[in-house]
Amino acid sequence: MDTFILTYSILFLALFIESIHSRYSRVAEHIRTRKRPDKELTEEEFKLVFHRSSTEEIDYDFVNLTTEITEIERKVLFTIDDKDYHLKLTRASSSVIPSGTLIRSAILWTDNQTHFHDEDSTDEHWGSSHIYEDLDKMATFLLRDDDDFTRYDGVFGGGKDMKVVGSLPARLVNIYGANYHFIYYANGSVSDVILNGAKQVVGSANTQAGLNNFYPKLLVLVDYTLFKILNKSYEETIRYLAIFWNAVDMKFKKFETPKINIIITGIIVPKNEGALKHVYDARIKSDMQKVNATKIITNSEHFFGANFSTESYFDNYDATFTMASLNDLEGQTGLAYIGAICKNNHNNAYVKDSGVFSGVLAAAHELGHLLASDHDEDVGCPGEINYNTRLTGTIMAEYRNNNVSKFIWS
């Protein structure tokens, strides 16, 4: 009897291993014989993965992610161009978008006024239980478990080496399996100016008091130009913001004192083009893809004026961040007053983002301004340093060196 059970068990195990081997052999053969994976995508699926039109050529890698799960971490292993990557992901202690974050849509009505409406509040799909990170590799991921597979969406690396990881649409999971992911570059930059009058609003009691812990509460507004890139999907937009702002938050985790943790207490997403009037009115009428970024900030003083809290029901925030996919006339990728957090009429920041996390560094830079940090060059610090024999950029440098792959606080 024991011999029969042992023989049956060995046979079952052999058949199981053979089925797994056969499955992966079919997938490998499928990849070899079919056209490029991105050419398998429909236009809708292409936009879901890359946040761009399928007419654009994307330089990407199609990679099989292997996951080893231990009690304390997820080890994610993959290879790109013969280089092995090892990420040690641990569950985030908190999410920048906590449960209960108020999400509202904005719409421009025929009365030329912006009106606000409740949308579904945040839920477990982008909470801390689904956010994993590797601080050493500057990696942050939103994980989604599907049967025996885990889908990874997020970013890793810094500077010119920052990459986006995108999971497969459901249809392609049935072809390739969910372990395969698209990986491509997220090219971002930083270029801003100190706003006129910024020196007069430097500092506040909170930023100068030597706190041990600081929790900047942000109201994030997604302009329609970015919302369109995110396929006009509220769920996709919130997932994107969860990854984006967790990536920004990670840059502040290098601070020992004070400890800085970002909390998003509100999100506004527009339903039509002109809903965020402070952005729309700053666009160049002869070329609506261009904008005067400085006007976004000056227009914000009126948009977030006396009636905003009453009409929108947003009043629990220290600063606003408006994200848009527009090209500034002077090439600025972000703007904020120095030391203006918690200061009405000046606590508004702008960041350019193209839907591929290109604005992460700029967002950290502008939040640094709000928290009273000057440009490094303005206070006698270099914008680049040799760190461990490697040329390294600083987050608060006025201009970014696009050849730098690592950024630190000076």
Swiss-Prot record:
Alphabetical GO biological process terms: membrane protein ectodomain proteolysis
- Superkingdom of the source? Eukaryota
Residues annotated as binding Zn(2+) = 365, 369, 375
- The record places the active site at 366
Report the GO terms under cellular component: extracellular region
Q: Which GO molecular function, any one, fits this protein according to its record?
A: metal ion binding
- Which cofactors go with this protein? Zn(2+)
Q: Which is an annotated Pfam family here?
A: Reprolysin_5
Q: How is the cofactor bound?
A: Binds 1 zinc ion per subunit.
In the record, the note on similarity to other proteins reads: In the C-terminal section; belongs to the venom metalloproteinase (M12B) family.
* Protein role: The recombinant protein has gelatinase activity. In vivo, injection of this recombinant into fifth instar L.oleracea (host) larvae results in partial insect mortality associated with the molt to sixth instar, with surviving insects showing retarded development and growth.
Query: Which PANTHER family is this protein grouped with?
Result: ADAM A DISINTEGRIN AND METALLOPROTEASE DOMAIN, SOL NARAE, ISOFORM C
UniProt protein name: Venom metalloproteinase 2
Q: Which organism is it from?
A: Eulophus pennicornis
